[in-house]
Amino acid sequence: FSSFEEDSQRDERPFVRKAESPPKAWPEPQRLQSILEEFGKSKKPMLIGGHGVWWGNAENKLEEVGKTLKIPVYNIPYHQKLLPETSDAYMGLADIHQYPPSAKALEESDLVMMLGGRLDNQMNFGNPPLFPKNSRLICINGSPEELEQNRSADQILLSDPSAFLEALMDFGKSRTSKERDEWYSLQKILRQEWVESSLS
């Protein structure tokens, strides 16, 4: 049995014992710039959001980036939806069985940015045929532990999801692309066709 005074150890650090927000990872400038330049060259990019986006409270920024930069947004299949079905940017699950249009998107995309997710068995560990060889795969995670699971990606970045999305927005909003607009519109058409066929 142990007994301590109510103010025990109050003269030792930490002196302030209120809850604080967790520290956030800031992206390494050179790696970030390399990824932004890859996006700048892409014509058919896509974003796959995972649990890290939710934990980082970055859902609204994810949606804003998708709509503004014309990047279709998908959700990893084993996490609750980050965006509602009514969102213009949200296409569906990155799962070729539950959402067949994602198979065509993954097959034709030239750049896949996975934010806050894992390259696990449901993501085929980042390998073909789910992620074709001719597509660049980039993983962005907010903690080193998550990033360790994504070493097979073409590029990896340790970054808080919000920080990455803000940088992507700043970089991309002045770089419009007719090809990206057409790509984004095509994914919306495929989504609508799938919804209509599911309801018929």
Residues covered by each model-derived region:
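Short, acidic/small-residue loops that bind anionic groups at enzyme active sites
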Residues: 70-79, 134, 138-144
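Glycine-rich beta-alpha junction loops
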Residues: 1-5, 51-53, 80, 144
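Short, solvent-exposed amphipathic alpha-helical segments in soluble enzyme
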Residues: 12-13, 59-70, 127-132, 155-156
